[in-house]
From Swiss-Prot:
Pathway: Pyrimidine metabolism; UMP biosynthesis via de novo pathway; (S)-dihydroorotate from bicarbonate: step 2/3. The lineage of its organism: Bacteria, Thermotogati, Deinococcota, Deinococci, Deinococcales. Its EC number is 2.1.3.2. Heterododecamer (2C3:3R2) of six catalytic PyrB chains organized as two trimers (C3), and six regulatory PyrI chains organized as three dimers (R2). This is Aspartate carbamoyltransferase catalytic subunit. SUPFAM superfamilies: Aspartate/ornithine carbamoyltransferase (SSF53671). Transmembrane segments: none annotated. One of its GO terms (molecular function) is aspartate carbamoyltransferase activity. One of its GO terms (biological process) is 'de novo' UMP biosynthetic process. Carbamoyl phosphate binds at R64, T65, R114, H142, Q145, G271, P272. Belongs to the aspartate/ornithine carbamoyltransferase superfamily. ATCase family. It catalyses: carbamoyl phosphate + L-aspartate = N-carbamoyl-L-aspartate + phosphate + H(+). Catalyzes the condensation of carbamoyl phosphate and aspartate to form carbamoyl aspartate and inorganic phosphate, the committed step in the de novo pyrimidine nucleotide biosynthesis pathway.
Amino acid sequence: MTAASSAGPRPRHLLDFQDWTPERLEAVLDNADTMLQVLDRPVKKVPALQGLTVCTAFFENSTRTRTSFELAARRMSADVVSFAAGNSSVSKGESLRDTIEVLTAYKVDAYVVRHHAAGAAHLVAKYSGKPVINAGDGRRAHPTQALLDAYTIRQEYGSLEGKKVAIIGDIRHSRVARSNAELLPKLGAEVVLCGPATLLPPDLAGQPGVRLTTDPREAVRGAHAVMALRLQQERMNGGYLASLQEYADTYQVNETLMREAESGAIVLHPGPMNRDLEISTEAADGPRSRIIRQVENGQAVRMSVLYHLLVGRA
């Protein structure tokens, strides 16, 4: 479990990628290779976090991300405290600050936080004084998803330098799109965000290494990886789309659209999928698909992040 040195101060949290240098990010991805080897063993466990307690504090429902983080912590021998807002004092009106201060009094060593409000993970970092990993805050950021996406692309090509990544779908409401738009250019990739004009947030247009387009063929042309995003209808108030069928007819990631990409281009999706809406079943299950590999890689990447923040000396 090695990591690069001389890469600047080691970040205390993973809230977004603002304080993370490319060298540190590559170190996390390098260490994920080692974690994948652990997951391939008959006994999938190492003592790296033995004696430490990780709290998964999820104020918003999650199955995949929460399970992935809890398994990642346990694979490294950490104790895991699982906090669900619906069964806690939060449902009785307790503030986020009071909840975190109580949990910290229980001697929790690190937090993995998901919250419906943008910036919530920053508040947890402020009030807990412990390392915090943002597992999704509103539509703002989901850094470990972006890291596992980057890792999956790097597995395919060896590097992200000079690669084109097209992300198609509901960009406006997607923390995954925002985190990838922040991360991938740091690692040398070009990012093209594509969707209907109503679902393209203009604030991302001026970001270095990022382009916006409403034309899916333009977005995918020459791409090395194409990511489909689901329509987050639970975050929409209406008026964004004429119809779901019209959206699928234009923006669905399918074999026809993928003909515009590089011949060896891969298909990604952060999940959960709405099959035959934003992605065809053929594309989701076909030879280009790396969707299940993303899930497998997620655990290794999250193990690497936990190691890096809690015990690594990168």
